[in-house]
Amino acid sequence: QGLDAGPATIVWHLQHHHGITVAAATVRRRLVAAGLIEPEPRKRPRSSYIRFQAELPNEMWQTDFTHCGLAHGQAEVLTWLDDHSRYALSVTAHVRVTGPIVVDTFTQSGADQGFPASVLSDNAMVYTTRFAGGRGGRNHLEVALVELGITQKHSRPNHPTTCGKVERFQQTLKKWLAARPAPDTIEALQALLDGFT
């Protein structure tokens, strides 16, 4: 019961019934060569991934938000990151990230650093309504970007590596925060974020 005619089973029978010791990898190679089994699909090679980086600062910003724990509750941390330099333009703590907050932090960062040529984000509702089924028109950020003549780019659904730079930044930030006592308030979390950046 539960045994098949795979390499491990064949190795067991050869060893126990015929006294022959052979590696499972050898049996597998022979079975594949004989066309008796299909090789398992392999992972995509790293070389097949299309890596990109903006050529200049302010060519493209990436943005995302993540959840962080407080001593008694949760908060959300919104990040704006320059794709070329990986400079954290803005890292802010909020009870909940909303469309107006996204626009406020974006316009403040633009006033401080100059606006980017394009913005890359995931498909969260605070960034785009393109998957909202046509309800409600454009959101706050989409309207602001059109008014400023800034190109908006999105990752494909279920492809978080497209926004990998900001995702990696947030992963590092969360590890750094986890090594410290949990803040009690949004203001205390913001003080920690200011110390990180």
Predicted regions and their residues:
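Basic, flexible linker segments flanking DNA-binding modules
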Residues: 1-60, 65-68, 136-139
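RNase H-like DDE/DDD metal-dependent nuclease/strand-transfer catalytic core used by mobile genetic elements
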Residues: 20-21, 55-62, 67-77, 83-195
